[in-house]
Each structure stands twice: as structure tokens, then as C-alpha cells.
């Protein structure tokens, strides 16, 4: 008689719970529950589950796109650890970041905000391309990323996670919730700690390959339900210290008496609330009041340049929704957003301000903008086969005046195997140039910032999706094309003057064409393969010349494989990526007669892999990142003289670290997410 072990029974039960049947054109398809699904409705995007995120280490939001063909995350420079997300070939300033469907990580939080969301706090993530709904504001130009945290109302229990890497990074995460009064009153605490103590200098340039980061992050969330009223709310606080610069041996290698150091200290406080009043459940009629506030304090020292910023943000939205009939939905609302930045930029006594740009001395650099607005959105939904969504916003900025935001989305599914989506719309944003790009302070160039206009762009997109029965499974094919055309834009000009970094207004054309195809198929109900290819054509006018955007790869090819054994005890994941080459900023000739850098960079490949072993109440995972060990050669230009004006750590297009291994454990006591 064969008796299945308890752990195997549990894993088999969990695996069976993820099985799902689909009936498609008289063909019955049995498959494991998808970890990445298309968004419902007219928007083009993906709903990414926790299982998909955990196919890699996923230490934070910035590391959660490893298996995603649409989104790139790159270092902004080689010293601070700042990262930016890219969607449709454009930087993260044009991607609206949301947490729990509330705008977040604006201004000074933008360069490091991807590290403020621990991976183990995330329950799911929604990534949409192109313009999003007008409900969330006017800012999403190229897409929207929304993070859903684990919930107080989830199954009661405690989750723990420990992680360590060969690069000297350690992380600990915990989240626990209790139901005080059934599921009508619940609370949850999430905690995170990380410490990277390594001083590794793998390329011998005298600088640490990665900043030392110590972060404490704590969040408390509540849910209360009574009758037709639902309340969600919470508070969070974060404290982070990051340091980088020359290692001890650098002075003996290159001379000098004072090591170049970067120190960035951050404190961040957030609060949010959601009040929902259900007026008529049968017709989906409800009123909701949503809001969040944040205080972001950052003190930074880049060599001898001091930059301090105190940023406050408040956002509120009053929303009314109703279904006139099952096919007709109306959403209307009011919104309010306020940004306040108090910035201080200074040099030590004796320094000549003009040697460092046009910003010194900036003793009281205040940027303040208040923007109330209103929107209306109509959606027609015919049995999910035809969905048309049209919305219009009107907003008034005390800085830029009144502006309109029209957006339209259409989904047409003429057959179960075929879906067409199209979209068109406009987006705006206010550039806080120094706060959003404060990593540029690490450069030795003079930093010049002009009086910037409000950014504005039109975005148009279309997509085709096929779900084709092949054998016992479905072959999923997708193709999409997006065009973004800027009417006004704040650009960072690396090209015109090799002694300057110039943030200025667009004077000419700027656009992005992005084309992507991807396919996925589940073999033997255990092995899931995905292949994707994306091509970007991004051009901007710099100094009167229409040039390809620098430090931007022209294409990306990705293949992912995920295999789970029949009993669900083992899982093997691998991701291979080929990143296309691109243009570097215009090089200059050094005093020795050499070029500062090559005019172009070549394509490079990366490989990530992870093995997970599941037990009844915990799992252990072991993996490696950048197993091809590709590193950008000399990511810091002028590393032998960091106090000179030729010191340039922002010429980064690829990895600055080599291969890395890691190990982690996830423990679930009572919870099943």
C-alpha cells in the first residue's frame, strides 16, 4: 500500500487548486492557473500574481519585472543605486505609479521608490500600456503600474521571509494579520529590514559596485466593514541610509587625500484611506472617498555638493459609479492633488558656484503646485465581447492653468480566440527636474536646469491577442504597437556640451514607436514557456539634431521557462534575455587623445535561474542573477579623478555587477495567499 507523505499531499492539493478548465470552441482545455493574465475590460495589460513574482527573488518592486517582456528596469547611474522603470521605450517619469490604486512615489521618491515596496508585501500587480483610465488622473502617458499589497482581510496567519546573497545583502520580511471581529474588522502589520554591507569592487575602478543600503520599512493596515460601508486605511514609515563611493584602496591606487563619498539619508511617512458607501448593490451604485498623504525628507551629499529636499504630497478623489443597465456604466468624480517641495542646494565655502551649474546657491528652492480636477467616464460593455470606454478630465493647475485630458479605449472580441484593442489619449505631467533626477548630482559636469514647461504627449496603441487550441492546451499569441508623440517635454541633454548636463525644454520632435510580439504555451501541464521580442524606435531632438535616445537598447528578446513537478514539490524557473545595442551620448576627446567612451554599445545577454522546494508550511529557494556575468566595462568615466569635471557615473546602459547567487526561505503559518 502506497501512502503519500503529508507534505506531498498538501503540495498536490495546492497544485490541484491551481488547475482550471476552459471550454473553447467545443475543445476542453485543462491547465494550471495562469500566473499572468490579461486585464479585464478595454485596457491592454497584465494582472501579475504573487506566484509569477516569486519565479525570481523579487526582493522589491524594482526586481519584480525579471520575467516581464514589456517592462525594463535599469540603473540610472553607477554610484547611487537609483533605478528607473521603462515602458514603451520611455523612462518611468511617464509611467504612473500606484499603490492600492492611489498615486504614489512622486518627485524626490521617484529615483529610489522602486526599492520602497518589498516583494513579499505584494499580493499582485497590474501593468497596463498606453493611456489608462481618467479616474486616476492625467499623468499616465505610456502606462500605469499598480501594486496591490497583501490584505488585512486575507486568511489569518503569519508570513516570514529571509534572504541573503553573495553580494552581502540580507533581507528579512514579516507580515501578520488578525480578524478582530470575523472579517468585518481586521488589521495587519508588515515589516521589512534590509542591509547591504559589502564593499565589493569587481572591476577595480576604486568604487563600490553597489551602494550600501540599510532600510527599515513598517506598515499597519486596517479594514472595517459594516452594512453598506467599507473602510480601508493605513500608515507606513520608512527610514533608509545609502552610501557609496571610493573604497579604501582607491587613494593608494589613484592618489589624493580625501575619498569621494555619496551619502543619502531618507525618511518617508505615508497614510492612506478609502471610504466606500454602497448605495445600490444590484446596480453597482456607490460613492467612494479616496486619499493619501506623504512626507518625504531626503538629505544627500554628493562629494562636496549638498542637496536636501522636504517634499509633501496630498491627494484626494471623490468617485461616483453606477450601472444604468448591465451594459452601461457611468463613473464621475472630483480630484485634488497638491505637491510641495522645499529644496536646498549648497557648496562648501570657497567653492565657485558657476563651476557647478546655474543652481547655486539654491537656499530656498520651493516648488508648489495645486491641481483640482473633475472627470466623467462612460463604459459600454456588451457581454465582454465589445467594450468601449471614453473619458474626459478637466484640471486646473495654479502653475500651468486649465487643461483637458481626453482618452478612449476599445476592446472587440469577435470570437473566443481573437481580441482586438485600440486606445488613444493625452497625458500631462509636471517635471520636478532636480528632485526627480537628483542622482545627476554625482556627475562632475555643470548641471543646468531651465524653466520647464508642463510636459504633454499623445499616445496611440493597438493590440491583437489570440488564444488558439493546440493539443490539450492553448497557445497564447499577442502583438501590440504603440506610438507616443510629445508636444512638450523636459529632456536631459548629454550631447550638446560635454561639460554640461542640461535639463531643458524640447525644441523639435520627440517620439517613440514600440512593437512587441509574445507567445506562451503550457506543455504537459507542467512546463510553461514564454518567448517575446520588442523593438523600440525612440528619437528626440538634442541641440537641433533628431537623435536616438541615448543609453536605450533598440530591442529586447526574452525567453522564460517554468517547470513544476506533478506533485508540486519542486519548481524550476529560468529567464534568458538579449538586450539590444544602442547609442551612447556624443563622446569627446580626452587630453590623452582618446575618446571618452565608444559612440555605441553592443547587445548583451543575461541569464537568471531559480529552484524552489515546497514544503507544507514553508519553501526554500536558491537562484542566481546575471549568470552570464556580463558587466558594463568602465561604467564610471573618470573614476581616477572623482573631483574633476570629467567624472561621469551616469553613462550606464547595462549591469554594473557580475554574477550573483542567493538563497531564501518563505514561511507561511496559517496563511495561503
Language-model features, listed with the residues they occupy:
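C-terminal beta-signal and adjacent terminal beta-strands/loops
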Residues: 529, 578-588, 612-673
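N-terminal periplasmic "start-of-domain" segments of outer-membrane beta-barrel proteins
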Residues: 23-56, 84
Amino acid at each position: 500500500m502506497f501512502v503519500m507523505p503529508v507534505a506531498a499531499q498538501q503540495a498536490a492539493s495546492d497544485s490541484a487548486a491551481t488547475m482550471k478548465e476552459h471550454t473553447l470552441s467545443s475543445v476542453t482545455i485543462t491547465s494550471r492557473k495562469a500566473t499572468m493574465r490579461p486585464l479585464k475590460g478595454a485596457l491592454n495589460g497584465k494582472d501579475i500574481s504573487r506566484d509569477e513574482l516569486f519565479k525570481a527573488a523579487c526582493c522589491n518592486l524594482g526586481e519584480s519585472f525579471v520575467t516581464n517582456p514589456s517592462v525594463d528596469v535599469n540603473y540610472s547611474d553607477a554610484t547611487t543605486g537609483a533605478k528607473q522603470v521603462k515602458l514603451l521605450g520611455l523612462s518611468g517619469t511617464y509611467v504612473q505609479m500606484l499603490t492600492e490604486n492611489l498615486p504614489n512615489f512622486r518627485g524626490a521618491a521617484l529615483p529610489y521608490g522602486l526599492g520602497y515596496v518589498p516583494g513579499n508585501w505584494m499580493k499582485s500587480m497590474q501593468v497596463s500600456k498606453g493611456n489608462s483610465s481618467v479616474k486616476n488622473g492625467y499623468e499616465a502617458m505610456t502606462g500605469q503600474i499598480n501594486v496591490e499589497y497583501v490584505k488585512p482581510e486575507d486568511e489569518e496567519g503569519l508570513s516570514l521571509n529571509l534572504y541573503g546573497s553573495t553580494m552581502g545583502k540580507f533581507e528579512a520580511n514579516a507580515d501578520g494579520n488578525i480578524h478582530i471581529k470575523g472579517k468585518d474588522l481586521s488589521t495587519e502589520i508588515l515589516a521589512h529590514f534590509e542591509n547591504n554591507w559589502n564593499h565589493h569592487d569587481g572591476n577595480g575602478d576604486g568604487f563600490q559596485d553597489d551602494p550600501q543600503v540599510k532600510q527599515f520599512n513598517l506598515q499597519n493596515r486596517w479594514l472595517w466593514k459594516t452594512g453598506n460601508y467599507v473602510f480601508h486605511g493605513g500608515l507606513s514609515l520608512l527610514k533608509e541610509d545609502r552610501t557609496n563611493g571610493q573604497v579604501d584602496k582607491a587613494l593608494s591606487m589613484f592618489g589624493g587625500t580625501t575619498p569621494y563619498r555619496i551619502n543619502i539619508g531618507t525618511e518617508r511617512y505615508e497614510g492612506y484611506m478609502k471610504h466606500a458607501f454602497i448605495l445600490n448593490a444590484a446596480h453597482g451604485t456607490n460613492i467612494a472617498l479616496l486619499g493619501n498623504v506623504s512626507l518625504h525628507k531626503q538629505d544627500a551629499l554628493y562629494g562636496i555638493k549638498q542637496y536636501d529636499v522636504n517634499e509633501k504630497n496630498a491627494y484626494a478623489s471623490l468617485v461616483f459609479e453606477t450601472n444604468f443597465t448591465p451594459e452601461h456604466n457611468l463613473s464621475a468624480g472630483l480630484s485634488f492633488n497638491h505637491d510641495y517641495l522645499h529644496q536646498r542646494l549648497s557648496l562648501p565655502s570657497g567653492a565657485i558656484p558657476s563651476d557647478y551649474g546655474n543652481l547655486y546657491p539654491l537656499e530656498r528652492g520651493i516648488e508648489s503646485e495645486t491641481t483640482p480636477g473633475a472627470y466623467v467616464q462612460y463604459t459600454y460593455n456588451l457581454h465582454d465581447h465589445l467594450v468601449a470606454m471614453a473619458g474626459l478630465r478637466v484640471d486646473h493647475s495654479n502653475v500651468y492653468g486649465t487643461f483637458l485630458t481626453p482618452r478612449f479605449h476599445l476592446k472587440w472580441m469577435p470570437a473566443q480566440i481573437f481580441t482586438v484593442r485600440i486606445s488613444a489619449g493625452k497625458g500631462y505631467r509636471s517635471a520636478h527636474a532636480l528632485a526627480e533626477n537628483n542622482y545627476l548630482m554625482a556627475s562632475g559636469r555643470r548641471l543646468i536646469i531651465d524653466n520647464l514647461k508642463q510636459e504633454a504627449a499623445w499616445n496611440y496603441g493597438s493590440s491583437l491577442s489570440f488564444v488558439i487550441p493546440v493539443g490539450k492546451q492553448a497557445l497564447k499569441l499577442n502583438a501590440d504597437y504603440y506610438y507616443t508623440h510629445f508636444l512638450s517635454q523636459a529632456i536631459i541633454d548629454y550631447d550638446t556640451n560635454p561639460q554640461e548636463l542640461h535639463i531643458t525644454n524640447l525644441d523639435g520632435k520627440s517620439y517613440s514607436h514600440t512593437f512587441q510580439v509574445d507567445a506562451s504555451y503550457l506543455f504537459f501541464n507542467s512546463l510553461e514557456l514564454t518567448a517575446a521580442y520588442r523593438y523600440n524606435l525612440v528619437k528626440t531632438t538634442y541641440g537641433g539634431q533628431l537623435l536616438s535616445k541615448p543609453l536605450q537598447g533598440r530591442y529586447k528578446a526574452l525567453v522564460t521557462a517554468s517547470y513544476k513537478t506533478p506533485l508540486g514539490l519542486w519548481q524550476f524557473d529560468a529567464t534568458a534575455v538579449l538586450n539590444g545595442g544602442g547609442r551612447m551620448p556624443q563622446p569627446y576627446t580626452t587630453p590623452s587623445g582618446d575618446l571618452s567612451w565608444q559612440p555605441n554599445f553592443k547587445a548583451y545577454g543575461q541569464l537568471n535561474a531559480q529552484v524552489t522546494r515546497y514544503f507544507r508550511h514553508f519553501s526554500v529557494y536558491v537562484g542566481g542573477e546575471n549568470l552570464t556575468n556580463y558587466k558594463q566595462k568602465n561604467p564610471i568615466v573618470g573614476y581616477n579623478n572623482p573631483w574633476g569635471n570629467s567624472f561621469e557615473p551616469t553613462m550606464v546602459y547595462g549591469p554594473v555587477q557580475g554574477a550573483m547567487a542567493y538563497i531564501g526561505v518563505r514561511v507561511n503559518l496559517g496563511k495561503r495567499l
